[in-house]
C-alpha cells in the first residue's frame, strides 16, 4: 500500500486529469469508495497498537478531507465548463423574428349571422332575441299552428312537459315583439333552435334567423324585392331567384325561395309569406289596418351554400383544419 502522503498526491493528480463528471466519479470511487484506498487505510488501523490508532486515524481523516476538497473543486470546475459549453451551443440569434401569436377567427356560422345582420341593419331592421325554452302559446298557438299539426309531435319537438319545450323556431320572438310594441315593426330574430333530427343536412340544434315587418300597405311585392336584394348581396352575384307557392300556418300566402345553383339545379334557401291575419289578431294588431311579411332561414344551410360545405355536421365538430379555412 502506498504511503499516505503519496496516496494524496496520486489522488489529486488523478482528479486533475478527469475531463468530465463521469471520469471524476470513477476517481472518487477508487479512493473514497467502500473498497477504495482510504477505506483500506482505515481498515489497517486495527493492526496498530490501541494507543496509536487515534493519531493515525486523525491523519487519515485529514488526508481524506484534502482529497474530498479537491474532488469538490474539480467538480465545480467541470460543471461550470459544461454549462458554458451548453450556453455556447444554445446561443440565440436575436435577429430571428419572434413567434407570433396565432389569431383566431369567427366561426363560419357566426360570419353568416353577422353578414345578414349587417345587411338588414342597413334596411332599418333591429335585432330581437327571446328565450330558448318556450311555451305552447308562443311557439305554436299564437302562430296559428293547430293542436293536430305534425310539428307538435314528440318525434319533431323536444318537450320538457305538456306545456314547455325547446323552441323549434325563433317565431316566438316575433310574437313577443308584436305584443310588446305597436307597429311599425321591423326586426330580425337570430338564435338557436331545436328539432329532433340528425343526418347529413340536419342537426338537433341549429341556428335560424327570422325577419318580420308590420306596417300599413305592406305587400308581397315588398317581400319579394327585399329577399331578392338580400340573396344577391349574400351570395355576391346576380342569382336567379324563384318563389314557389307553399304552406305555413302563420303566413298566407306562403312561399319557398330557391336560387339557381352552379350545377343548374334549384336550391331551396328560405321560407316566407305575408303574416296571417289570425297571427295579427292573436297579438292585438288589427289586420284591417296593418299587414306584414315574415321570412325564416337556416344559418347553417346558407353557410353551406355560400362556402360549398357538403356536411352540416362539420360546423359542430370543432376540427381546426376545417375552421381555419374561414379565417
Curated annotation (Swiss-Prot):
Cofactor note: Binds 2 magnesium ions per tetramer.
A GO cellular component entry from the record: cytoplasm
Keyword Glycoprotein: no
PROSITE patterns reported in the protein's UniProt record: AA_TRNA_LIGASE_II
Location in the cell: Cytoplasm
Cofactor(s) this protein cannot do without: Mg(2+)
Entry GO MF terms: ATP binding; magnesium ion binding; phenylalanine-tRNA ligase activity; tRNA binding
Annotated transmembrane regions: none
Keywords linked to the UniProt accession: Aminoacyl-tRNA synthetase, ATP-binding, Cytoplasm, Ligase, Magnesium, Metal-binding, Nucleotide-binding, Protein biosynthesis
Enzyme Commission identifier(s): 6.1.1.20
Known catalytic reactions: tRNA(Phe) + L-phenylalanine + ATP = L-phenylalanyl-tRNA(Phe) + AMP + diphosphate + H(+)
Broad class of the protein's primary localization: cytoplasm
Amino acids binding Mg(2+): 252
GO biological process: one example: phenylalanyl-tRNA aminoacylation
Pfam family, one: tRNA-synt_2d
Quaternary data: Tetramer of two alpha and two beta subunits.
UniProt similarity note: Belongs to the class-II aminoacyl-tRNA synthetase family. Phe-tRNA synthetase alpha subunit type 1 subfamily.
HAMAP family: Phe_tRNA_synth_alpha1
Official protein name in the record: Phenylalanine--tRNA ligase alpha subunit
Organism from which the protein derives: Sodalis glossinidius (strain morsitans)
Lineage: Bacteria, Pseudomonadati, Pseudomonadota, Gammaproteobacteria, Enterobacterales
Amino acid at each position: 500500500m502506498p504511503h499516505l502522503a503519496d496516496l494524496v498526491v496520486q489522488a489529486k493528480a488523478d482528479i486533475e486529469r478527469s475531463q468530465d463528471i463521469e471520469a471524476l466519479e470513477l476517481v472518487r470511487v477508487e479512493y473514497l469508495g467502500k473498497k477504495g484506498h482510504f477505506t483500506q487505510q482505515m481498515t489497517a488501523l486495527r493492526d496498530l497498537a490501541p494507543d496509536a490508532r487515534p493519531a493515525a486515524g486523525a491523519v487519515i481523516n485529514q488526508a481524506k478531507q484534502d482529497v474530498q476538497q479537491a474532488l469538490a473543486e474539480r467538480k465545480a470546475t467541470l460543471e461550470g465548463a459544461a454549462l458554458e459549453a451548453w450556453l455556447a451551443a444554445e446561443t440565440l440569434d436575436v435577429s430571428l423574428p419572434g413567434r407570433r401569436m396565432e389569431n383566431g377567427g369567427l366561426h363560419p356560422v357566426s360570419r353568416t349571422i353577422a353578414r345578414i345582420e349587417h345587411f338588414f341593419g342597413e334596411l332599418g331592421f333591429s335585432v330581437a332575441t327571446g328565450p330558448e325554452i318556450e311555451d305552447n302559446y308562443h311557439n305554436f298557438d299564437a302562430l296559428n299552428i293547430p293542436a293536430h299539426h305534425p310539428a307538435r309531435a314528440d318525434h319533431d319537438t323536444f318537450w320538457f312537459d305538456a306545456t314547455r319545450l325547446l323552441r323549434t323556431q325563433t317565431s316566438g320572438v316575433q310574437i313577443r315583439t308584436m305584443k310588446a310594441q305597436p307597429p311599425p315593426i321591423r326586426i330580425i330574430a337570430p338564435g338557436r333552435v331545436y328539432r329532433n333530427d340528425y343526418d347529413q343536412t340536419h342537426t338537433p340544434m341549429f341556428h335560424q334567423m327570422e325577419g318580420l315587418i308590420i306596417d300599413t300597405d305592406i305587400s308581397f311585392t315588398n317581400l319579394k324585392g327585399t329577399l331578392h336584394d338580400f340573396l344577391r348581396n349574400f351570395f355576391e352575384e346576380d342569382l336567379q331567384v324563384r318563389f314557389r307557392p307553399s304552406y305555413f300556418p302563420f303566413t298566407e300566402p306562403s312561399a319557398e325561395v330557391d336560387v339557381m345553383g352552379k350545377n343548374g339545379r334549384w336550391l331551396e334557401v328560405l321560407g316566407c309569406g305575408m303574416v296571417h291575419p289570425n297571427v295579427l289578431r292573436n297579438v292585438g294588431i288589427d289586420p284591417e289596418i296593418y299587414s306584414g311579411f315574415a321570412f325564416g332561414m337556416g344559418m347553417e344551410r346558407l353557410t353551406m351554400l355560400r362556402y360549398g360545405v357538403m356536411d352540416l355536421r362539420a360546423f359542430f365538430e370543432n376540427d381546426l383544419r376545417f375552421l381555419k379555412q374561414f379565417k
